[in-house]
């Protein structure tokens, strides 16, 4: 049975399956406007007692890097909410995306989040699910995969750690792409979203044990029943859609957050 320990709080044990699961992705905290961030915090506050598990499928943060002795101030509100959520008994699992793959021990040891190496196959609401953020999965993305391998290497992390956050953060923001998406200067890549959906269909065809394929990255909410009882799910984003998915043993629903 997986076990999560968080410094300064009780140990929490979770069963191998969850009856009610929320999936969210591409929140991009640190770049979305304050009202969007507050909406996501309100969303998290609504979850205790309502669900068993939260899966964050990449790009929770627009940029995340674990320094040895500091955390980024801008993320304190969401880290506090996530820690409180774990304390109520909600299991939180996190897949690193292309913006926040530089995770380390802090999120697990201090917050209580389980970090997943994706692509991975896990159980979500009694369904066998193939889960990945979605970046670098398609044919023709070999150059990106090579670049990703370099920037996620131990040597690159060590070099990046030498730069103080006040210097590195503005540089990262310039190459993020999220500000342009917020301002409407970066259009949705519909062709890539379509190709990722086709990849999901191929996975379901090739792996009959799967009930569900879950991707993020495209920022396009999608729920497709490929064949009876077998689905492709993309939870969308919180830049434009404020969308998420609710999975139970009986159903899968795409929803949009509208706080009262």
Which residues fall in each region the model found?
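Conserved beta-sheet core of the metallophosphoesterase superfamily
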Residues: 110-117, 130, 135, 139-151, ...
């Amino acid at each position: 049975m997986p076990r999560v320990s968080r410094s300064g709080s009780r140990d929490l044990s979770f069963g191998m399956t969850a009856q009610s699961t929320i999936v969210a992705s591409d929140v991009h905290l640190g770049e979305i406007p304050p009202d969007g961030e507050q909406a996501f915090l309100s969303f998290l506050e609504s979850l205790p007692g309502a669900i068993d598990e939260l899966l964050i499928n990449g790009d929770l943060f627009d940029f995340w890097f674990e320094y040895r002795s500091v955390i980024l101030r801008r993320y304190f509100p969401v880290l506090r909410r996530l820690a409180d959520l774990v304390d109520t008994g909600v299991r939180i699992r996190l897949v690193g995306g292309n913006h926040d793959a530089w995770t380390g021990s802090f999120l697990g040891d201090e917050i209580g989040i389980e970090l997943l190496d994706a692509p991975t196959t896990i159980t979500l609401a009694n369904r066998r699910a193939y889960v990945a953020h979605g970046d670098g999965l398609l044919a023709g993305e070999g150059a990106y995969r090579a670049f990703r391998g370099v920037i996620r290497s131990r040597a690159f992390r060590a070099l990046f750690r030498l730069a103080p956050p006040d210097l590195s953060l503005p540089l990262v923001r310039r190459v993020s792409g999220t500000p342009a998406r917020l301002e409407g200067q970066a259009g949705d890549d519909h062709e890539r979203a379509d190709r990722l959906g086709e990849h999901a269909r191929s996975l379901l065809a090739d792996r009959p044990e799967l009930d569900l394929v879950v991707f993020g990255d495209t920022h396009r909410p999608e729920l497709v029943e490929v064949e009876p009882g077998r689905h492709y799910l993309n939870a969308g984003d919180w830049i434009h859609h404020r969308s998420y998915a609710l999975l139970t043993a009986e159903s899968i629903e795409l929803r949009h957050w509208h706080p009262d």
